[in-house]
Amino acid sequence: MNLSNRFAYKANVSQFIKSSDEEVLGDLTDQYRHRQLEQQQINAWRYQIKELKRVLINFPDATLLLEFEIPRIGKRVDAILIHNGSILVLEYKVGAKSYDASSIDQACDYALDLKNFHKASHHLNIVPILIATDAPNKNSIVELGLDGIAKPILANSENLLNVLNLVSNSLPKSTTDTDLWVNSTYHPTPTIVEAAQALYKGHKVEEISRSDAGAINLTKTCSHVSKIIDDAKANKKKAICLITGAPGAGKSLAGLNIATERMRYLENEHAVFLSGNGPLVDVLREALVLDQLAENEFLPKDQKVKRKVAEQKASAFIQNIHHFRDDNLASSEPPVEKVVIFDEAQRAWNKDQASSFMKRKRGQDDFAMSEPDFLLSVMNRHQDWCVVVCLIGGGQEINTGEAGITEWITALKENYKNWDIHFSNEIFKSDYALSQEWLEDQGALNLYPENDLHLAVSLRSFRAEKLSDFIGALIAGEGSKAKEIKQHLTNYPIYVTRDLDKAKNTLKNLARGSERIGLVASSNAIRLKPEGIYVKGQIDPTQWFLKAKSDIRSSYYLEDVATEFDVQGLEIDWVGVCWDANFRVEDGKWNAYNFSGSKWQSVHDLEKRKYIANSYRVLLTRGRQGVVIFVPKGDNSDLTRQQVFYDGIFDYLKSCGIQEV
């Protein structure tokens, strides 16, 4: 997408100064004609227009944009000044008597977003300036980072002109084609939380996703699924779509988009996004609720949304798969949803796990179905049509009893042969544990291989598409291969240290603006406790992922550690991975251990070994921008924390090309 329609006002500064205040104000208010505008906002704009006319008198050739939208963040920058080849981001706080931390972060966030996702800004210097109009003077200095983003500069009404002159004189001068800059493409890679918020508000998936040649276009996959849904509806058919993809390739984003598209399509065509990942569901729902409540600021009193109403609406869009199952267990009626999207469908329980759970937890002694079989039976209650969309990740199973994709095919073969099965041939790769020969042996099924149902490139880290390959080689014990791949991760920092305080300080120094940092560890990393890392303490993922820097429950405080079960499917900017002796290098290869009672026990069962390895794969792929790994030094006076346990891990990680802090 381009940003040409993403601002309320654009003009050369000399033209802006000649325009009447009311003319400029008219353009600003027109952008918000569908919303209730508070008088306070209109007054703030009047003030900004007068102030900008006063201070920009020395910059007649610069270009000014007002109310410039940053789609990924869902907010608008008060003003952008394009001058001498640099971008000045101006954020006003009219009437503010101090420079509060959240406002400083906000200005920095705008600069970071432009630098990372707006193509024409990649190689330009960007200076965020926070203008707290009534705050005291602060010493100003232009400090550019290696990527060309300056540390936020603090200004007030009195010294803004001096600050602008300082910035102008401090930066190298060049020329920028303003029209090219404005029309340049914007390719964000939002977090799953940001994506859900944007789609929920009605943004299109192409507005919030990359569309460059390096990534398969998500719109292609979503459009293909939409055609399958239309065909099923028109021809009274039942179909299942199996969408595969690399970790972070955008499967959940595709699923959320399909859910929102079909929710809006017709009132009698309900769609729901289902996940068995409790923390993911809780975090996404709470994020949507908070977003809706934040909108209240712009609504008249009689239109403000109450929390309970916002929660009900969010719950209809995103549901826990186990709640969906229980609701439909109590009824034999078809569900209201005609389209259901199952996130991480390979995690659905096999017959033994599902039956055991239903007997123990639900008192259902006669339940004898796998989870895929039961969920398909629920959707099969529809007399006319329905579509099931399965989002399938490869090589990520971390729980006992997760059946993989074969359980879905088996259920279709045994009970629902009339269903159409749409999939990509990528599903036969080893990561998905489904062989073409096995599928062909299942007899007559309505199979439709379609390439558009595979998402090939990881979008999770906008800095490092090769990250999943690197982590895969590292976890597989292929150190030399990992080291070779690491050479291509030049813009994705990965560090290792034996000092936890150093790890924490590194995370704090790497993060800018409101970039989120946090500590994670394996759920069986029991012997990190002497380091102050206690994995058995329950965290609230909604607080950990969503609370602000000032809240001790947030990940920012680096006090509460999240495990693979808390963070699966979610991500933060900079992650600190705390490594314990449950996955250690011995005689040149990885060995898995489980802590039981008061000692480590070697894990021989191949499935359980795989779960432990994959827990570290999950942890190491949670950082959008970089990773800091902490490996304890150990203590030879403690049999459970022998130094040799940890030295092998540390040495191996360094041999993979990971730099020590």
Predicted regions and their residues:
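Conserved Walker A/P-loop ATP-binding site and its immediately adjacent core
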Residues: H270-V289
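Conserved helicase/translocase motor-coupling segment
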Residues: G255, N399-E402, F423, F428-A581, ...
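Hydrophobic anchor at the beta1->P-loop junction of P-loop NTPases
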Residues: I243
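Conserved lysine of the Walker
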Residues: K251
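Accessory nucleic-acid engagement/destabilization modules that flank
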Residues: M1-T189
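Conserved RecA-like ASCE ATPase "motif II neighborhood" in helicase/translocase motors
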Residues: R307-M379, E559-T563
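C-terminal accessory regions
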Residues: V387, Y557-V661
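N-terminal pre-P-loop "Q-motif" helix
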Residues: S209-A239
